[in-house]
Amino acid sequence: MPTLDLPRHTTVRSTLAEQYGPVLRAHAEILAECMPLVDVDHARSRIRKGQVGYDALRVLRSCGDPMPRYARVLDAFEVAGFLSNDDRRSLLHSELDVDDLVSGWFTGDRTPRDSTRRIARQAAIVVGNALLRAASALIEPATVWREWTRIVCPCCGGFPDIALRERGAGRTLVCARCDSQWRTAHQGCLSCRTVDEPTIARIANADVGYDLVMCNGCGRFLKERPRRGIESFIVERALATELDLAAEHRGLRI
């Protein structure tokens, strides 16, 4: 019987999702147990007025000391095989500050080239993402914000790092911080609204199934792919790490 070969990115995605199992479980546990402080009514009122719902750093601080959660995620990275026991211990006793790692994530610090420091940053991001996802879910558990028209996330004010192509001409944007999603009909740069080449450059990466979409005018980039077949956004971002590194090497930002 003839068989259909799956695209390489489909196989890579499913394999990585399986390998990331311990990390995804740690993320789900943090998401379920955390209790971020959010004035839900006030946040909803702000969003209706076109303003960002809450102060993300204040919400993170309301969740207490991030170190125990960070240690749990590092444990998960070790179980998953991304980190040795010695490196995990070294990171836990290093001078790296979890709050600084999260703040760097907020302000667009470059992804570390060193693999161990990159895992440390990823672990801090997993924690921060879980806490902000929980906060955003309190405001609106619906999947997609359909009436939001700004570039930044309606909930936490983060910029999108992923764009999912929908049927037709629209795209769904995904917040790099809290994974909230909102629609846009615009096909070019979200910042300067340019749509034409060569200002807009698109590089396809068949191995991961993403296009790296770069604006040479304002220096922003997005990772874009069809919506179908996506995994957890933690897995999606891990899959596309090399695209982030390539964009950052060019001096671009999300």
Predicted regions mapped to residue ranges:
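N-terminal alpha-helical interaction blocks
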Residues: 2-140
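Cys/His-clustered metal-coordination modules, chiefly Zn-binding fingers
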Residues: 136-251
